[in-house]
């Protein structure tokens, strides 16, 4: 099983053109209802967009807000989300580094945020504090924000375990989507034969054998 600790530095850090990697072909059936969990609703697709709704809460067996040692005294509550994802994402030549805030959405309809807190930027490092280092995240990789909105700040561990080997490693379906429209995968989480760590660019992305760019979260055995 994967060790949770290596995910402390995971982020969608930039978008840029990369060389092809011929090791994998990801599943691009993003309009297939089986790509998503039962927590999303009103899934619809056209040639340009994937759209769906969610209430912002994961499966009921995900144990939320446990393992947090630096609580902000918030509690996850239902929200009304509507997501619209482009089906024709484009890569930027110049990389873009996100700041604290949302950077994507998971396939269970829960927002994915940058790993940083909204704390002040460290003048020496140029970075904000890490939510994981600050002890603000639960065992699933998320917490409730100031609006009682649950969201992930690192790889969504409980969601990936819920999706399982079949979807993640065999069918190679995404675990989420970045705000730029590119899918997020977890190849190598269960099966080291799918480990693409050495093939990723500085944005934690790569291009598959059919020309589809995707991001991948870090995993170790």
At which residue positions do the language-model features occur?
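Short helix-loop boundary/capping segments
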Residues: 130-133, 147-196
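Bacterial N-terminal signal peptides
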Residues: 10-19
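Solvent-exposed N-terminal domain segments of exported/luminal and surface proteins
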Residues: 24-133
């Amino acid at each position: 099983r994967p060790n949770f600790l290596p995910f402390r530095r995971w982020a969608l850090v930039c978008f840029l053109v990369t060389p092809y990697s011929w090791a994998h072909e990801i599943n691009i059936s993003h309009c297939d209802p089986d790509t998503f969990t039962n927590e999303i609703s009103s899934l619809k697709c056209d040639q340009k967009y994937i759209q769906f709704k969610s209430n912002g809460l994961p499966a009921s067996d995900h144990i939320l807000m446990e393992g947090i040692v630096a609580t902000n005294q918030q509690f996850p509550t239902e929200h009304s989300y509507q997501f619209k994802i482009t089906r024709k994402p484009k890569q930027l030549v110049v990389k873009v580094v996100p700041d604290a805030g949302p950077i994507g959405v998971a396939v269970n309809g829960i927002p994915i945020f940058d790993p940083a807190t909204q704390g002040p930027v460290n003048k020496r490092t140029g970075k904000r504090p890490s939510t994981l280092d600050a002890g603000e995240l639960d065992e699933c990789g998320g917490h409730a924000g100031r609006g009682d909105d649950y969201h992930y700040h690192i790889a969504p561990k409980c969601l990936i375990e819920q999706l399982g080997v079949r979807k993640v490693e065999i069918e190679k379906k995404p675990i989420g989507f970045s705000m730029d429209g590119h899918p997020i995968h977890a190849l190598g989480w269960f099966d080291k034969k799918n480990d693409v760590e050495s093939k990723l660019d500085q944005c934690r992305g790569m291009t598959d054998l059919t020309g589809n760019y995707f991001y991948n979260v870090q995993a170790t055995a």
